[in-house]
Protein backbone atom coordinates (compact mmCIF):
# COMPACT_ATOMS: atom_id res chain seq x y z
CA UNK A 1 0.00 0.00 0.00
CA UNK A 2 1.30 3.47 -1.00
CA UNK A 3 2.17 5.88 1.78
CA UNK A 4 -0.59 8.51 2.29
CA UNK A 5 1.83 11.41 1.81
CA UNK A 6 2.68 10.02 -1.64
CA UNK A 7 -0.91 9.41 -2.77
CA UNK A 8 -3.05 12.14 -1.13
CA UNK A 9 -3.61 15.02 -3.65
CA UNK A 10 -2.57 17.77 -1.17
CA UNK A 11 0.05 15.91 0.85
CA UNK A 12 1.67 14.76 -2.40
CA UNK A 13 2.55 18.39 -3.27
CA UNK A 14 4.10 18.95 0.19
CA UNK A 15 5.92 15.62 -0.06
CA UNK A 16 7.52 16.53 -3.40
CA UNK A 17 8.47 20.00 -2.08
CA UNK A 18 9.77 19.32 1.45
CA UNK A 19 10.18 15.59 2.14
CA UNK A 20 11.20 13.49 -0.88
CA UNK A 21 12.67 16.46 -2.76
CA UNK A 22 15.97 15.35 -4.40
CA UNK A 23 18.62 17.76 -3.05
CA UNK A 24 22.36 18.03 -3.86
CA UNK A 25 24.38 16.32 -1.12
CA UNK A 26 26.98 19.10 -0.87
CA UNK A 27 24.92 22.27 -0.30
CA UNK A 28 26.30 24.40 2.53
CA UNK A 29 24.78 26.51 5.31
CA UNK A 30 24.26 29.36 2.79
CA UNK A 31 21.33 27.37 1.39
CA UNK A 32 19.57 27.64 4.80
CA UNK A 33 18.39 31.19 4.17
CA UNK A 34 15.50 30.25 1.85
CA UNK A 35 13.80 28.30 4.65
CA UNK A 36 14.70 31.06 7.16
CA UNK A 37 12.91 33.58 4.93
CA UNK A 38 9.82 31.34 5.01
CA UNK A 39 9.99 31.24 8.83
CA UNK A 40 10.43 35.05 8.96
CA UNK A 41 7.42 35.54 6.68
CA UNK A 42 5.20 33.30 8.84
CA UNK A 43 6.40 35.08 12.00
CA UNK A 44 5.67 38.50 10.45
CA UNK A 45 2.17 37.45 9.36
CA UNK A 46 1.34 36.04 12.82
CA UNK A 47 2.67 39.00 14.83
CA UNK A 48 1.23 41.46 12.28
CA UNK A 49 -2.22 39.88 12.56
CA UNK A 50 -2.15 40.23 16.36
CA UNK A 51 -1.01 43.86 16.08
CA UNK A 52 -3.71 44.67 13.50
CA UNK A 53 -6.38 43.56 16.02
CA UNK A 54 -5.40 46.46 18.32
CA UNK A 55 -4.11 49.06 15.85
CA UNK A 56 -6.27 51.93 14.54
CA UNK A 57 -5.38 53.42 11.15
CA UNK A 58 -6.42 56.96 12.02
CA UNK A 59 -4.09 59.97 12.25
CA UNK A 60 -5.47 61.05 15.64
CA UNK A 61 -5.23 57.64 17.34
CA UNK A 62 -2.53 55.64 15.45
CA UNK A 63 0.36 56.76 17.68
CA UNK A 64 -1.59 56.23 20.93
CA UNK A 65 -2.83 52.81 19.71
CA UNK A 66 0.83 51.69 19.45
CA UNK A 67 1.40 52.97 23.02
CA UNK A 68 -1.77 51.08 24.07
CA UNK A 69 -0.44 47.86 22.47
CA UNK A 70 2.87 48.18 24.36
CA UNK A 71 1.33 49.15 27.72
CA UNK A 72 -2.12 47.55 28.03
CA UNK A 73 -2.27 44.51 25.72
CA UNK A 74 -0.98 41.23 27.22
CA UNK A 75 2.54 40.73 25.84
CA UNK A 76 1.81 43.51 23.34
CA UNK A 77 5.31 44.97 23.81
CA UNK A 78 7.02 41.72 22.77
CA UNK A 79 4.66 41.25 19.79
CA UNK A 80 5.31 44.82 18.59
CA UNK A 81 9.12 44.57 18.96
CA UNK A 82 9.24 41.03 17.53
CA UNK A 83 7.39 42.37 14.47
CA UNK A 84 9.72 45.38 14.07
CA UNK A 85 12.94 43.41 14.64
CA UNK A 86 11.53 40.46 12.66
CA UNK A 87 11.52 42.79 9.64
CA UNK A 88 15.23 43.48 10.23
CA UNK A 89 15.98 39.74 10.44
CA UNK A 90 13.89 39.24 7.28
CA UNK A 91 16.06 41.71 5.35
CA UNK A 92 19.33 40.31 6.73
CA UNK A 93 18.28 36.85 5.48
CA UNK A 94 17.07 38.39 2.20
CA UNK A 95 20.36 40.17 1.48
CA UNK A 96 22.41 37.06 2.35
CA UNK A 97 20.10 34.95 0.15
CA UNK A 98 20.60 37.30 -2.84
CA UNK A 99 24.36 37.43 -2.16
CA UNK A 100 24.62 33.64 -2.08
CA UNK A 101 22.79 33.34 -5.42
CA UNK A 102 25.18 35.92 -6.88
CA UNK A 103 28.26 34.14 -5.54
CA UNK A 104 27.32 30.63 -6.61
CA UNK A 105 25.75 31.59 -9.96
CA UNK A 106 22.18 30.53 -9.15
CA UNK A 107 20.93 33.57 -11.13
CA UNK A 108 21.23 31.40 -14.28
CA UNK A 109 17.84 29.97 -13.26
CA UNK A 110 16.22 33.03 -14.87
CA UNK A 111 12.59 32.33 -13.89
CA UNK A 112 13.51 31.74 -10.22
CA UNK A 113 15.83 34.79 -10.23
CA UNK A 114 13.23 37.13 -11.77
CA UNK A 115 10.47 36.05 -9.36
CA UNK A 116 13.02 36.59 -6.57
CA UNK A 117 13.60 40.19 -7.72
CA UNK A 118 9.81 40.78 -7.76
CA UNK A 119 9.66 39.29 -4.23
CA UNK A 120 12.46 41.63 -3.08
CA UNK A 121 10.67 44.71 -4.46
CA UNK A 122 7.32 43.63 -2.95
CA UNK A 123 8.96 43.02 0.45
CA UNK A 124 10.63 46.45 0.34
CA UNK A 125 7.28 48.11 -0.48
CA UNK A 126 5.60 46.23 2.40
CA UNK A 127 8.32 47.19 4.90
CA UNK A 128 8.20 50.84 3.81
CA UNK A 129 4.43 51.00 4.39
CA UNK A 130 4.84 49.29 7.77
CA UNK A 131 7.31 51.99 8.82
CA UNK A 132 4.59 54.62 8.23
CA UNK A 133 2.00 53.01 10.53
CA UNK A 134 3.31 54.07 14.00
CA UNK A 135 2.70 57.66 12.83
CA UNK A 136 5.73 59.11 14.59
CA UNK A 137 7.87 61.96 13.23
CA UNK A 138 10.05 59.71 11.04
CA UNK A 139 6.96 57.82 9.79
CA UNK A 140 5.28 61.01 8.57
CA UNK A 141 8.36 62.68 7.09
CA UNK A 142 9.67 59.42 5.62
CA UNK A 143 6.32 58.90 3.88
CA UNK A 144 6.31 62.50 2.62
CA UNK A 145 9.88 62.40 1.26
CA UNK A 146 9.81 58.93 -0.33
CA UNK A 147 6.35 59.20 -1.97
CA UNK A 148 7.24 62.72 -3.16
CA UNK A 149 10.02 61.19 -5.28
CA UNK A 150 7.35 60.17 -7.79
CA UNK A 151 6.84 63.85 -8.58
CA UNK A 152 10.14 63.60 -10.51
CA UNK A 153 8.30 61.65 -13.25
CA UNK A 154 7.60 64.09 -16.11
CA UNK A 155 3.97 65.18 -16.82
CA UNK A 156 2.17 62.68 -14.52
CA UNK A 157 4.44 62.83 -11.42
CA UNK A 158 2.50 65.41 -9.36
CA UNK A 159 -0.84 63.75 -10.13
CA UNK A 160 0.57 60.35 -9.12
CA UNK A 161 1.82 61.69 -5.77
CA UNK A 162 -1.58 63.26 -4.97
CA UNK A 163 -3.30 60.03 -6.06
CA UNK A 164 -1.13 57.98 -3.67
CA UNK A 165 -1.61 60.51 -0.85
CA UNK A 166 -5.38 60.70 -1.40
CA UNK A 167 -5.14 64.50 -1.06
CA UNK A 168 -2.64 67.33 -1.15
CA UNK A 169 -0.49 66.02 1.71
CA UNK A 170 0.21 62.85 3.70
CA UNK A 171 -2.89 62.54 5.89
CA UNK A 172 -5.61 60.15 7.10
CA UNK A 173 -6.34 58.78 3.60
CA UNK A 174 -2.64 57.95 3.14
CA UNK A 175 -2.39 56.15 6.48
CA UNK A 176 -5.58 54.14 5.87
CA UNK A 177 -4.51 52.92 2.42
CA UNK A 178 -0.98 52.15 3.58
CA UNK A 179 -2.39 50.03 6.43
CA UNK A 180 -4.69 48.17 3.99
CA UNK A 181 -1.80 47.51 1.59
CA UNK A 182 0.60 46.57 4.40
CA UNK A 183 -1.94 44.00 5.62
CA UNK A 184 -2.60 42.40 2.20
CA UNK A 185 0.92 42.41 0.69
CA UNK A 186 2.41 39.67 2.95
CA UNK A 187 -0.19 37.28 1.51
CA UNK A 188 0.84 38.37 -2.00
CA UNK A 189 4.45 37.68 -0.94
CA UNK A 190 3.38 34.19 0.24
CA UNK A 191 1.80 33.48 -3.17
CA UNK A 192 4.91 34.77 -4.97
CA UNK A 193 7.11 32.60 -2.71
CA UNK A 194 5.12 29.52 -3.82
CA UNK A 195 5.68 30.52 -7.48
CA UNK A 196 9.38 31.07 -6.65
CA UNK A 197 9.61 27.53 -5.19
CA UNK A 198 7.67 26.10 -8.13
CA UNK A 199 10.24 27.47 -10.59
CA UNK A 200 13.13 26.32 -8.36
CA UNK A 201 11.82 22.76 -8.18
CA UNK A 202 11.51 22.68 -11.99
CA UNK A 203 15.30 22.91 -12.26
CA UNK A 204 16.44 21.65 -8.85
CA UNK A 205 18.84 23.40 -6.49
CA UNK A 206 22.28 24.62 -7.46
CA UNK A 207 25.30 23.63 -5.31
CA UNK A 208 28.59 25.31 -4.25
CA UNK A 209 30.65 23.71 -7.05
CA UNK A 210 28.18 24.96 -9.70
CA UNK A 211 28.28 21.65 -11.62
CA UNK A 212 25.18 19.43 -12.16
CA UNK A 213 24.54 17.13 -9.20
CA UNK A 214 21.94 14.78 -10.70
CA UNK A 215 24.12 11.75 -9.96
CA UNK A 216 24.45 12.63 -6.27
CA UNK A 217 21.16 13.67 -4.66
CA UNK A 218 19.68 12.89 -1.26
CA UNK A 219 16.13 13.38 0.10
CA UNK A 220 15.45 16.76 1.72
CA UNK A 221 14.03 15.07 4.85
CA UNK A 222 15.61 14.18 7.29
CA UNK A 223 19.02 15.55 6.19
CA UNK A 224 18.20 19.17 5.40
CA UNK A 225 15.21 19.54 7.72
CA UNK A 226 17.59 18.85 10.64
CA UNK A 227 20.18 21.20 9.14
CA UNK A 228 17.56 23.95 8.69
CA UNK A 229 16.36 23.57 12.30
CA UNK A 230 19.84 24.67 13.46
CA UNK A 231 19.50 27.83 11.33
CA UNK A 232 16.02 28.47 12.71
CA UNK A 233 17.28 28.13 16.32
CA UNK A 234 20.13 30.58 15.64
CA UNK A 235 17.74 33.03 13.96
CA UNK A 236 15.27 32.84 16.86
CA UNK A 237 18.09 33.28 19.40
CA UNK A 238 19.29 36.46 17.66
CA UNK A 239 15.72 37.77 17.23
CA UNK A 240 14.76 37.12 20.88
CA UNK A 241 18.04 38.61 22.16
CA UNK A 242 17.41 41.73 20.09
CA UNK A 243 13.73 41.94 21.09
CA UNK A 244 14.25 41.39 24.82
CA UNK A 245 17.55 43.21 25.47
CA UNK A 246 17.70 46.02 22.91
CA UNK A 247 14.35 46.32 21.07
CA UNK A 248 14.99 49.84 19.72
CA UNK A 249 18.57 49.27 18.58
CA UNK A 250 17.65 49.31 14.88
CA UNK A 251 14.81 51.85 15.16
CA UNK A 252 14.83 55.64 15.13
CA UNK A 253 14.34 57.70 18.33
CA UNK A 254 12.37 60.32 16.31
CA UNK A 255 9.58 57.77 15.86
CA UNK A 256 8.79 58.06 19.59
CA UNK A 257 7.70 61.64 18.94
CA UNK A 258 4.10 62.02 17.65
CA UNK A 259 3.77 63.38 14.11
CA UNK A 260 4.08 67.16 13.81
CA UNK A 261 3.76 68.43 10.20
CA UNK A 262 5.12 71.84 11.34
CA UNK A 263 8.42 70.45 12.69
CA UNK A 264 10.91 68.67 10.42
CA UNK A 265 13.41 66.21 12.00
CA UNK A 266 17.10 67.22 11.62
CA UNK A 267 17.73 64.32 9.22
CA UNK A 268 14.98 62.31 7.50
CA UNK A 269 15.98 58.72 6.79
CA UNK A 270 14.22 55.38 6.17
CA UNK A 271 14.83 52.11 8.05
CA UNK A 272 18.41 50.75 8.01
CA UNK A 273 17.72 48.15 5.30
CA UNK A 274 16.91 50.88 2.74
CA UNK A 275 19.86 53.12 3.59
CA UNK A 276 22.15 51.83 0.80
CA UNK A 277 19.56 52.80 -1.84
CA UNK A 278 18.78 56.08 -0.01
CA UNK A 279 22.48 57.05 -0.12
CA UNK A 280 22.55 56.42 -3.88
CA UNK A 281 19.43 58.61 -4.21
CA UNK A 282 21.04 61.45 -2.20
CA UNK A 283 24.34 61.15 -4.08
CA UNK A 284 22.84 62.34 -7.38
CA UNK A 285 22.29 66.14 -7.41
CA UNK A 286 19.45 65.92 -9.96
CA UNK A 287 16.03 64.74 -8.59
CA UNK A 288 15.00 62.61 -11.61
CA UNK A 289 18.54 61.23 -11.90
CA UNK A 290 18.50 60.32 -8.21
CA UNK A 291 15.16 58.50 -8.54
CA UNK A 292 16.43 56.54 -11.57
CA UNK A 293 19.64 55.65 -9.68
CA UNK A 294 17.53 54.51 -6.69
CA UNK A 295 15.38 52.24 -8.89
CA UNK A 296 18.38 50.91 -10.81
CA UNK A 297 20.26 50.10 -7.58
CA UNK A 298 17.77 47.22 -7.17
CA UNK A 299 16.82 46.49 -10.79
CA UNK A 300 20.50 46.14 -11.74
CA UNK A 301 20.09 42.58 -10.35
CA UNK A 302 17.88 41.75 -13.35
CA UNK A 303 20.77 42.54 -15.74
CA UNK A 304 23.25 40.16 -14.08
CA UNK A 305 22.25 36.99 -16.05
CA UNK A 306 22.61 38.91 -19.36
CA UNK A 307 26.03 40.34 -18.38
CA UNK A 308 27.53 37.02 -17.25
CA UNK A 309 30.48 35.99 -19.44
CA UNK A 310 32.04 33.26 -17.30
CA UNK A 311 32.28 29.68 -18.55
CA UNK A 312 32.11 28.55 -14.92
CA UNK A 313 28.92 28.87 -12.95
CA UNK A 314 30.12 29.34 -9.38
CA UNK A 315 32.67 31.90 -8.11
CA UNK A 316 34.19 29.13 -6.00
CA UNK A 317 37.12 28.78 -8.45
CA UNK A 318 37.26 32.41 -9.65
CA UNK A 319 39.54 34.51 -7.40
CA UNK A 320 39.11 37.78 -9.34
CA UNK A 321 35.31 37.52 -9.24
CA UNK A 322 35.49 36.68 -5.52
CA UNK A 323 37.48 39.87 -4.82
CA UNK A 324 34.90 41.92 -6.73
CA UNK A 325 32.01 40.22 -4.91
CA UNK A 326 33.45 41.08 -1.48
CA UNK A 327 34.27 44.60 -2.69
CA UNK A 328 30.58 44.94 -3.62
CA UNK A 329 29.52 43.63 -0.18
CA UNK A 330 31.79 46.11 1.64
CA UNK A 331 30.59 48.91 -0.67
CA UNK A 332 26.97 48.16 0.34
CA UNK A 333 27.96 48.33 4.02
CA UNK A 334 29.67 51.69 3.38
CA UNK A 335 26.54 53.00 1.62
CA UNK A 336 24.39 51.83 4.57
CA UNK A 337 26.65 53.62 7.06
CA UNK A 338 26.67 56.86 5.02
CA UNK A 339 22.86 56.73 4.72
CA UNK A 340 22.53 56.76 8.51
CA UNK A 341 24.59 59.97 8.81
CA UNK A 342 23.49 63.58 8.11
CA UNK A 343 24.22 64.57 4.51
CA UNK A 344 27.10 67.01 4.93
CA UNK A 345 30.73 67.21 3.76
CA UNK A 346 32.76 64.92 3.72
CA UNK A 347 30.02 62.28 4.10
CA UNK A 348 28.27 63.34 0.86
CA UNK A 349 31.56 62.88 -1.01
CA UNK A 350 32.06 59.40 0.51
CA UNK A 351 28.45 58.55 -0.49
CA UNK A 352 29.02 59.68 -4.08
CA UNK A 353 32.33 57.81 -4.24
CA UNK A 354 30.71 54.63 -2.85
CA UNK A 355 27.70 54.86 -5.22
CA UNK A 356 29.90 54.50 -8.30
CA UNK A 357 31.38 51.03 -7.47
CA UNK A 358 27.85 49.67 -6.76
CA UNK A 359 27.07 50.00 -10.47
CA UNK A 360 30.56 49.68 -11.98
CA UNK A 361 31.32 46.36 -10.22
CA UNK A 362 28.09 44.74 -11.46
CA UNK A 363 27.90 46.32 -14.94
CA UNK A 364 31.57 46.56 -15.98
CA UNK A 365 34.12 44.92 -13.66
CA UNK A 366 32.34 41.55 -13.09
CA UNK A 367 31.93 40.80 -16.86
CA UNK A 368 35.54 41.97 -17.42
CA UNK A 369 36.83 39.67 -14.65
CA UNK A 370 34.81 36.79 -16.18
CA UNK A 371 36.42 37.46 -19.58
CA UNK A 372 39.97 37.58 -18.12
CA UNK A 373 39.41 34.37 -16.09
CA UNK A 374 38.14 32.58 -19.21
CA UNK A 375 41.30 33.65 -21.09
CA UNK A 376 43.58 32.56 -18.22
CA UNK A 377 41.97 29.11 -18.30
CA UNK A 378 42.28 29.08 -22.14
CA UNK A 379 38.48 28.80 -22.62
From Swiss-Prot:
GO biological process, one term: mitochondrial electron transport, ubiquinol to cytochrome c
Keywords noted in UniProt: Electron transport, Heme, Iron, Membrane, Metal-binding, Mitochondrion, Mitochondrion inner membrane, Respiratory chain, Transmembrane, Transmembrane helix, Transport, Ubiquinone
Pfam families assigned: Cytochrom_B_C, Cytochrome_B
Cofactor-binding details, from the entry: Binds 2 heme b groups non-covalently.
Any one GO MF annotation of this record: ubiquinol-cytochrome-c reductase activity
Entry GO terms, CC: mitochondrial inner membrane; respiratory chain complex III
Subcellular location: Mitochondrion inner membrane
Binding site for heme b b566: 97, 196
Similarity annotation: Belongs to the cytochrome b family.
Subunit composition and interactions: The cytochrome bc1 complex contains 11 subunits: 3 respiratory subunits (MT-CYB, CYC1 and UQCRFS1), 2 core proteins (UQCRC1 and UQCRC2) and 6 low-molecular weight proteins (UQCRH/QCR6, UQCRB/QCR7, UQCRQ/QCR8, UQCR10/QCR9, UQCR11/QCR10 and a cleavage product of UQCRFS1). This cytochrome bc1 complex then forms a dimer.
Annotated function: Component of the ubiquinol-cytochrome c reductase complex (complex III or cytochrome b-c1 complex) that is part of the mitochondrial respiratory chain. The b-c1 complex mediates electron transfer from ubiquinol to cytochrome c. Contributes to the generation of a proton gradient across the mitochondrial membrane that is then used for ATP synthesis.
Protein name: Cytochrome b
